[in-house]
From Swiss-Prot:
Chain positions of motif Cell attachment site: 51-53
Molecular functions (GO terms): toxin activity
Entries under Pfam families matching the protein: Disintegrin (PF00200)
PANTHER family: ADAM A DISINTEGRIN AND METALLOPROTEASE DOMAIN (PTHR11905), DISINTEGRIN AND METALLOPROTEINASE DOMAIN-CONTAINING PROTEIN 28 (PTHR11905:SF32)
Miscellaneous notes: The disintegrin belongs to the medium disintegrin subfamily.
Protein name from the UniProt record: Disintegrin cereberin
Length: 72
């Protein structure tokens, strides 16, 4: 939702302050296929295996999201 950096629904998430819905100090992310222990996974790590003619999807190192890498 607007103003939230992370989903504050679960107080058990070590990356997110449940009271403020903001990332804890030093955290880059709270969840996502390219987020591990509150940090972005390094560039090039496979986050989703290839299907059909599409190549493996890989983390960018700049986001917790796993981008879709598709042939055009």
């Amino acid at each position: 939702e607007a103003g939230e950096e992370c989903d504050c629904g679960s107080p058990a998430n070590p990356c997110c302050d449940a009271a403020t819905c903001k990332l804890r100090p030093g955290a880059q992310c709270a969840e996502g296929l390219c987020c591990d222990q509150c940090r972005f996974i390094k560039k090039g790590k496979i986050c989703r295996r290839a299907r059909g003619d599409n190549p493996d999807d890989r983390c960018t190192g700049q986001s917790a999201d796993c981008p879709r890498n598709r042939f055009h």
